[in-house]
């Protein structure tokens, strides 16, 4: 069974990029997360302790983005994926990071999928 816990449009103003202006001026960074979990234990116990705490995860992702002052979106997205997979409930994660103001006429970003399950 694979259920999905998702966080969409998590928006943080942060330093991200290699251009001189990107190193000085924070820009919006938008993150979407989809974490594969098995929600049966939480459904049966009705205990919050048996769930993935998405509020806590959102705070951790925001802190990572702001404190990291990343040069490359590739480094950031892999660090976010590793953070998500450190949650014991998560068996896989899709992460999308967008820089909506990087180009005047388009939204750019990167999407990755990582899994703890090896087939």
Locations of regions flagged by a protein language model:
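Histidine-centered catalytic/metal-coordination loop motif
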Residues: 23-86, 115
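N-terminal presequence-like segments and the immediate start of the first folded domain
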Residues: 1-26
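Conserved small/polar residues in nucleotide/adenosyl-binding loops
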Residues: 117-119
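Residue-level recognition of well-ordered beta-strand positions that form the cores
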Residues: 11, 32-36, 96-98, 111-113
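Short, well-ordered secondary-structure micro-motifs
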Residues: 18, 44-46, 105-108
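C-terminal structural segments of small proteins and small subunits
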Residues: 85-107
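Extended beta-sheet lipid-handling architectures
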Residues: 5-7, 80, 95
